Amino acid sequence: FYGCKSLLSLPDISKWNTNNVPNMEYLFCNCESLLSLPDISKWNTNNITNIEYLFCNCESLSSLPDISKWNTKNITNMAGLFYGCKSLLSLPDISKWNTNNVINMSGLFNNCESLKSLPDISKWITNNVKYMEYLFNACTSLSSLSDISKWNTNNVKTIKYLFNDCKSL
């Protein structure tokens, strides 16, 4: 669906067999007019390693399906996952996502300018993360953040603009 700028809705793709899908990057990216997504909460994500820019620039979405129970243990790249989701008012509770293998988190919440808070991501394991730049960049309405002081950043190579333009923090 990449780049379907005028698409307002999607057919029911909730029963798609995603058992063998390793890569979902850019799947809904640049669907700027998309108002809602079908329930994709039950997709089998066991084999997925890349969700980079999955919802990128879905500018009209104000909410997402409950993806809190997605199995994220094999994901190495979640860069820009919610990048440019300017109308998102909240996120599903992704606090229990397994981030043990994630290497790239850059721009994960970048430009989510309507989000006032995030789920508690303080317990995310960041031991393997190398890229965190722009993680919360331009989250202009973000007024609270869980305590991420215990995140292990020993392997991080780039962390620039982490909280750039977070005017409400």
Predicted features and spans:
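Negatively charged
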Residues: 1-169
